[in-house]
């Protein structure tokens, strides 16, 4: 499966499995894969550059906010990210500068059905939820009504024609 291939490649590239990393042997049927956390991940590894859509998470330690912004923006995807910090001002600087659809601070995947959800770059077009999603179905039309009915010289000329 795609998950098995991604995990195997990450191991070959030098990422270290902290937990998981294999299919569960507790289920005879199905494709249940153990939640997997990787450490010692570098920015050029596929496990961090490609969307996994599986219970696999790479952990990459960074030294500065600038490094995090540059690394995040270097990928072709932009669905969501989470930052854990006590410095909300720095977190908001990251939110302003990272090209991402959903930016979570101190909590992954906080869901709010009134808030727009969707990615940037190759992680999707458009938004679900919120007024932004409704805008996808709206077609604007301008309607102007002149209740005055008087001649407008600027439009009809001096004779009202």
Please report, for each region that a protein language model flagged, where it lies by residue:
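Short alpha-helical functional segments enriched in proximate histidine and acidic residues
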Residues: 6-9, 13, 71, 75
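Short secondary-structure junctions
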Residues: 12-23
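Conserved strand-to-helix beginnings and helix N-cap segments that scaffold or border functional pockets
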Residues: 1-4, 31
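Conserved C-terminal structural/oligomerization subdomain of aldehyde/semialdehyde dehydrogenase
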Residues: 23-25, 32-161
């Amino acid at each position: 499966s795609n998950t098995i291939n991604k995990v195997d490649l990450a191991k070959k590239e030098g990422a270290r499995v902290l937990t998981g990393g294999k299919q569960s042997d507790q289920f005879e049927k199905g494709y249940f894969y153990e939640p997997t956390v990787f450490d010692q991940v570098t920015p050029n590894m596929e496990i961090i550059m490609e969307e996994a859509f599986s219970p696999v998470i790479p952990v990459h330690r960074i030294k500065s906010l600038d490094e995090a912004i540059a690394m995040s923006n270097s990928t072709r995807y932009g669905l969501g990210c989470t930052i854990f910090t006590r410095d909300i001002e720095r977190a908001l600087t990251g939110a302003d500068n990272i090209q991402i659809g959903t930016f979570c601070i101190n909590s992954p995947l906080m869901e709010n059905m009134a808030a727009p959800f969707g990615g940037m770059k190759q992680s999707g077009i458009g938004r679900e939820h919120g007024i932004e999603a409704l805008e996808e179905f709206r077609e604007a039309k301008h309607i102007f009504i002149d209740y005055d009915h008087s001649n407008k010289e600027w439009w009809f000329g001096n004779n009202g024609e």
